Swiss-Prot record:
Gene: P2rx6
Organism: Rattus norvegicus (Rat)
Origin: domain of life: Eukaryota
Function as written in the Swiss-Prot or TrEMBL entry: Acts as a modulatory subunit rather than a functional channel. Unlike other P2XRs members, P2RX6 does not seem to form functional homotrimers. P2RX6 requires the presence of P2RX4 or P2RX2 to become functional at the cell surface. P2RX6 can be translocated to the nucleus and functions as a nuclear regulator of post-transcriptional modifications in neurons.
Spans through the membrane: 42-62, 336-356
Protein name: P2X purinoceptor 6
Glycosylation: residue positions: 167, 197, 212
A GO MF term: purinergic nucleotide receptor activity
PROSITE patterns for the chain: P2X_RECEPTOR
Xref: Pfam families: P2X_receptor
Primary localization: membrane
Length: 389
């Protein structure tokens, strides 16, 4: 007969009693109780209806939760401007402007500049000449007003220390600069006003690599003359990406004459929203136009060496319209994984509805105590009894 260490049985009993008191050895199973509670029942059905409408109407249909998406397409943009204009100014006499003159840069890109007005200062050479009176701190009465070597922020050159006559009414500081200095008198009307009748051709191609799908905004046609005569119209010619400049500016809410005088910036947005479940038939560009800012100009010069061996230049201050083309896009196609995720999310929300209704029934309802006792009860198996002989 083996002897057990003292206290082993009592320790095991104590551990078992503790586990029972903590409920560690209890097993819980669900109990379904049919309750005749109208307001909780109505709340449950309304919440379930809301979940079903959200999942089917919004998540699946409106947001296309059954589709896999590609929101980073490869983008290609090619632009071409067509038109000819003639200007008649004293400094340049009669001059013809074509695409090579009024478009910067000459290669079509998604950002380009169309010249609509200009200010020319011909035959400049480096030397001494009076500063323009419109420049701050340029006007003077004596040489003391023109410190030698001083160069202002808006000055055209470096002061020589002399105060000289600019014309019959103004005296200004003499400067070392490209002479004569540029005038600040902008033409009252845009010199290239014919630019409003120029046409802009935008060819945009988007490629969604995830779906091996590509689409262009230009009509696929064998007629080589089609794009020479068509103009864009959202209803009659949606696949003719040829825009008249005047119409394009008008679609931004601006006026071409005002914008052409001192320049500005126009944004052209092209957005692709493609549903590839329809084999690409529901994939067309949407255009929008914004006037981004008013006032845009920059300077450029043509240099040459005169017969006397002196370097000369003609300075052009160009005003015009800067066009910024921004292309965005997304494409969706049916896939099992996003569909399963959307449906699974809806099922989880339906489970949350049951949980919320239980809270209403067991904690908020006036008969919460009764429902609590009915739903939760403790079940013990009857103890077996033995009769002694």
């Amino acid at each position: 007969m083996q002897l057990q260490p003292a206290g082993t049985g009592s320790m095991a009993s104590a551990v078992a009693a503790a586990l029972v008191s903590w409920g560690f050895l209890d097993y819980k199973t669900e109990k379904y109780v049919m309750t005749r509670n109208c307001w909780v029942g109505i709340s449950q059905r309304l919440l379930q209806l809301g979940v079903v409408v959200y999942v089917i109407g919004w998540a699946l249909l409106a947001k296309k939760g059954y589709q896999e998406w590609d929101m980073d397409p490869q983008i290609s943009v090619i632009t071409k401007l067509k038109g000819v204009s003639v200007t008649q100014v004293k400094e340049l006499e009669k001059r013809l402007w074509d695409v090579a003159d009024f478009v910067r840069p000459s290669q079509g890109e998604n950002v380009f500049f169309l010249v609509t007005n200009f200010l020319v200062t011909p035959a400049q050479v480096q030397g001494r000449c009076p500063e323009h009176p419109s420049v701050p701190l340029a006007n003077c009465w004596a040489d003391e007003d023109c410190p030698e070597g001083e160069m202002g922020t808006y000055s055209h050159g470096i002061k020589t220390g002399q105060c000289v006559a600019f014309n019959g009414t103004h005296r200004t500081c003499e400067i070392w600069s490209w002479c004569p200095v540029e005038s600040s008198a902008v033409p009252r009307k845009p010199l290239l006003a014919q630019a409003k009748n120029f046409t802009l051709f935008i060819k945009n191609t988007v490629t969604f690599n995830k779906f091996n799908f590509s689409r262009t905004n230009a009509l696929d046609t064998w007629d080589n003359t089609y794009f020479k005569y068509c103009l864009y119209d959202s209803l009659s010619s949606p696949y003719c990406p040829v825009f008249r400049i005047g119409d394009l500016v008008a679609m931004t809410g601006g006026d071409f004459e005002d914008l052409a005088l001192l320049g500005g910036a126009v944004g052209i947005n092209i957005h692709w929203d493609c549903n590839l479940d329809t084999k690409g038939s529901d994939c067309s560009p949407q255009y929008s136009f914004q006037l981004q800012e008013r006032g845009y100009n920059f300077r450029t010069a043509n240099y040459w060496w005169a017969a006397s061996g002196v370097e000369s230049r003609s300075l052009l201050k160009l005003y015009g319209i800067r066009f910024d083309i921004l292309v965005t896009g997304q494409a969706g196609k049916f896939a099992l994984i996003p569909t399963a995720i959307t449906v699974g999310t809806g099922a989880a929300w339906l489970g949350m509805v049951t949980f919320l209704c239980d809270l209403l029934l067991l904690y908020v309802d006036r008969e919460a105590g009764f429902y609590w006792r009915t739903k939760y009860e403790e079940a013990r198996a009857p103890k077996a009894t033995t009769n002694s002989a």
